[in-house]
């Protein structure tokens, strides 16, 4: 009986340890919630050259297509939906971006 109690206790402890190891929370980078801007170069009314990129939108709940000029450096601008979602919401990345890359 003592052996059974000891084994049951060890099993519970081991189970709790595995739960803590597997439950590491994802911490979204702060730049995922920053406004992306438009990438205009100084003196431009609008970007002369712009490309379709992706930016994470907290209010939308995922990444959205975004026109980005060639100037400025911004971390919340990604070349593909999958790279945007993998960085900012990895749990939903593959299903959210299905067909967009």
UniProtKB/Swiss-Prot annotation:
Carbohydrate attachment residues: 53, 73, 92
What InterPro entries does the entry give? Kunitz_BPTI, Kunitz_BPTI_sf
GO MF entries: serine-type endopeptidase inhibitor activity; toxin activity
Q: Residue ranges of the BPTI/Kunitz inhibitor domain? A: 32-88
Q: What GO biological process terms are annotated to this protein in UniProt?
A: envenomation resulting in negative regulation of voltage-gated potassium channel activity in another organism
Q: Does the keyword Disulfide bond apply?
A: yes
Top-level taxon of origin: Eukaryota
- According to its UniProt record, where is this protein located? Secreted
The Gene Ontology CC terms held by the record are: extracellular region
- Functional summary from the UniProt entry: Anticoagulant protein that modulates blood feeding of ticks on vertebrate species. Delays normal clotting of host plasma.
What is the official name of this protein in its record? Answer: Kunitz-type anticoagulant protein HA11
Q: What is the lineage of its organism?
A: Eukaryota, Metazoa, Ecdysozoa, Arthropoda, Chelicerata
What gene name is given for the protein in this entry?
HA11
